Regions:
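Conserved catalytic cysteine-centered active-site region
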Residues: 94-106, 110
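His/Asp/Glu-rich metal-coordinating catalytic cores
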Residues: 118
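Conserved CoA-thioester-binding segment of acyl-CoA-metabolizing enzymes
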Residues: 1-59, 81, 95
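Glycine- (often His-adjacent) and acidic-residue-rich active-site loop
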Residues: 58-93, 112, 140-143
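N-terminal glycine-rich phosphate-binding loop for ADP-containing cofactors
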Residues: 3-8, 23, 74-79, 86-89, ...
Length: 724
């Protein structure tokens, strides 16, 4: 077979054990070539008289990361023929591997995810290293396990645990897999294949059980109990993911196998997988999967052959919520951190916040006490710059004050080495302004974390025209090491995420002042898939932040900002959101939000100040209209961000909207979702509202041009006028 394609090799030892090795770097994914080769290798091993038993393993200490996801898009687009339904699950795994007259053992190191674990479950036994990861994460991509996993996993670990593993997509490590019965023994990487060889021969000699996973029943709960478990799982799934169909399909397929037998279950699995593969949800989630992995491809940066420099020590200026969160993220990934504050009281408060962040992990069972102590030892406090002389990067996270930040960057130049990266976590101030008094503007960069910084997955890396590509490469590497998805954006008010979403709340305010109910808007937007509606979000971030951020947009984009007095009026009355337990909602002792009838008087006053009246049409909007009137202005601003080159590509805006604002990933991100509706439709609706309600809704020139051509709003990298 062509060595550039994925393949398997077969090597027969003197003991009569054939070692079949999956080779498809970097994670030995199961491409169609690999699957066909696996079938050929198995057929050969079963034909050969010198082969007594079989061990399946993966090259480079990785079993298999699962089905090749890049093939999904090709199959969806019709450029590659899909394997016939059931080819892998029935023809290869059930009828060839599991039914073979020669025993098979899977030797698992590194990863056995998705199709990789399904291949392993087709074998008669599994040996794993202690830290190998085993799981079925297919639901994250909008499909179900399609190589027999829905039938084999419940029979190996029991129905309740199998449902949990599939519905949460969370893998287990080798040691935990042993206690569940998913693997039969643990071995070191060095001894793994040898242990598997001996195990396979022991099965042949009947010293160990010869088990066909598909027909095992001893781990399955009695039918009545199984139905109860399945019904409970359905109820929980409908509650947690009301917009998603595929988790319920997964439960149905599992049930079919339990009630009607594994063969019926495999047939239903194959049919369901085929249908889900072509669903909008799957297309959206596959797009997000690749968008997340594509953020580090930045023209003029990642294509220069630059290697990231080693960052050992990082200093954080400011121990507030953001600074302490950034410090937590860094020490959790093994970086030495200096946290600087202006006095002992503030410094101790910052260190205490970091401790609290770590202690919550201990409390949840995600960190041992020993690991807590070791991680905390990486943090040191400081009140001056003396200890900054050997730091590799500084991240400034002080209050949003231009002159203060300018002075800090001047001081940093005096104390830090010439190679030290000077980063700011500002979310509103122009980076050029912050660094204008410094001599070395090539090492100034934005590192915009989202709060809480140790939890939120996105990191906006903001570059100015003077920022060195090397500094960007360095920060991309740090972002990945601290388990963030780093997105490189240009320098502008709000950068990418905050700028895209500034019309989100403004559109909601416009609707409310013209008669739409506040709580209806929040209900509809939450039903659409957002974590919360715009008014609940305002309460969460606080009115002070909302007014300050809004002020930046009024200043920079006056012609398209909707100016409402609703929030300032409420703040005057000491309503500031969740912190004061009164905002758009009232909050009880447990911080539960409840609608507040008093809000009407503020809305009426804001309406009077704005000089607008209730529009009867806006008092009875459909859910669809509310979603479009809230999100189409966001799409409009995203088009500007893309056209101005603030973002390199539309996919970066998609992943940013998902990770920065909670846009539902199963809709593919803001631009992907917009393209499913069409530029013509979006433009026509914006024009209609612009005529009725003013310039806030006016389509930008880029959106209008794409609509006139009937072209999608997403641009490829080489089309983008990257003003980075």
């Amino acid at each position: 077979m062509n060595s550039t394609k994925g393949r398997t090799t077969i090597d027969v030892g003197t003991d009569g054990v054939a070692i079949i090795t999956i080779i498809n770097p970097p994670v030995n994914s199961l491409s169609l070539d690999v699957l066909n080769s696996l079938k050929e290798s198995y057929d050969q091993a079963l034909r050969r008289d010198d082969v007594k038993a079989i061990v399946v393993t993966g090259a480079q200490r990785k079993f298999s990361g699962g089905f090749d996801i890049s093939a999904f898009g090709k199959i969806q687009g019709g450029t590659v023929a899909a394997p016939k339904p059931g080819f892998v699950s029935m023809e290869i795994l059930c009828d060839t591997v599991a039914a073979a007259r020669k025993p098979s053992v899977a030797a698992i190191d590194g990863l056995a995810l998705g199709g990789g674990l399904e291949v392993a479950m087709g074998c008669h036994a599994r040996i794993s290293t202690p830290n190998a990861q085993l799981g079925l994460p297919e639901l994250q991509l909008g499909v179900i396990p399609g190589f027999g996993g829905t039938q084999a996993l419940p029979r190996l670990v029991g129905l309740a645990k199998a449902l949990e593993m599939m519905l949460t997509s969370k893998p287990v490590k080798g040691q935990a897999a042993l206690s569940l019965g998913l693997v039969d023994a643990i071995a070191s990487s060095k001894e793994l294949v040898n242990t598997a060889r001996h195990w396979a021969l022991d099965i042949l000699e009947r010293k160990r059980p010869w088990i066909n996973s598909f027909y095992r029943t001893d781990k399955l709960e009695p039918l009545g109990e199984a139905r109860e478990i399945l019904n409970f799982a359905r109820a929980q799934t409908r509650k947690r993911a009301p917009n998603l169909k595929h988790p319920l399909v997964c439960i149905d397929v599992i049930e079919e196998g339990i009630v009607s037998g594994p063969r019926a279950g495999l047939l239903k699995e194959a049919e369901a997988f085929q249908g889900l593969l072509h669903s909008d949800t799957c297309k959206s989630l596959v797009h997000i999967f690749f968008a997340q992995r594509g953020t580090t491809k930045v023209p003029g940066v990642s294509d220069l052959g630059l290697k990231p420099r080693r960052i050992n020590k990082v200093a954080i200026l400011g121990g507030g919520l953001m600074g302490s969160g950034i410090a937590t993220a860094l020490i959790l990934s093994g970086y030495s951190v200096i946290l600087k504050e202006v006095n002992d009281k503030f410094l101790q408060a910052g260190i205490d916040r970091v401790k609290a962040n770590l202690k919550s992990r201990v409390k949840k069972g995600n960190m041992s006490q020993e690991k807590y102590e070791k991680t905390l030892s990486l943090l040191k406090g400081a009140l001056d710059y003396e200890s900054f002389r050997d730091v590799d990067m500084v991240i400034e996270a002080v209050i949003e004050n231009v002159s203060l930040k300018q002075q800090i960057f001047l001081d940093l130049e005096k104390f830090c080495t010439p190679h030290c990266i000077l980063a700011s976590n500002t979310s509103t101030i122009d980076l050029n302004l912050i660094g204008e008094k410094t001599k070395s503007q090539d090492r100034i960069i934005g590192a915009h974390f989202f709060s809480p910084a140790h939890v939120m997955p996105l990191l906006e890396i903001v570059r100015t025209p003077k920022t060195s590509p090397q500094v960007i490469v360095d920060l991309l590497d740090v972002g990945k090491k601290i388990k963030k998805t780093p997105v490189v954006v240009g320098n502008c008010t709000g950068f990418a995420v905050n700028r895209m979403f500034f019309p989100y709340t403004q559109a909601a305010l416009l609707l409310v002042e013209r008669g739409t109910d506040i709580y209806q808007i929040d209900r509809v937007i939450t039903k659409f898939g957002m974590p919360m509606g715009p008014f609940r979000l305002c309460d969460l971030v606080g009115f002070g932040v909302a007014i300050a951020t809004g002020g930046q947009f009024v200043l920079n984009f006056p012609e398209r900002t909707y100016k409402s007095m609703l929030i300032p009026l409420m703040q005057e009355d000491k309503r500031s959101g969740e912190t004061t337990r009164r905002g758009f909602y009232v909050y009880d002792e447990k911080r539960k939000a409840n609608p507040d009838p008093e809000i009407k008087k503020y809305v009426e006053k804001a309406r009077e100040i704005a000089g607008v009246t209730i529009d009867p049409k806006l008092t009875k909007l459909s859910d669809k209209d509310i979603v479009e009137m809230i999100f189409f202005p966001v799409v409009n601003e995203a088009c500007r961000v893309l056209n101005e080159g603030i973002a390199v590509k539309a996919a970066d805006l998609d992943i940013s909207s998902v990770m920065g604002m909670g846009f539902p990933p199963y809709r593919g991100g803001i631009m992907f979702w917009a393209d499913t509706l069409g530029s013509k439709y979006i433009c026509s609706r914006l024009e209609e509202w612009s005529n009725l309600y003013g310039g806030f809704f006016k389509p930008c020139s880029y959106l209008a041009q794409q609509a006139a051509k009937g072209a999608p709003l997403s641009l490829s990298v080489d089309q983008a006028k990257a003003r980075l």
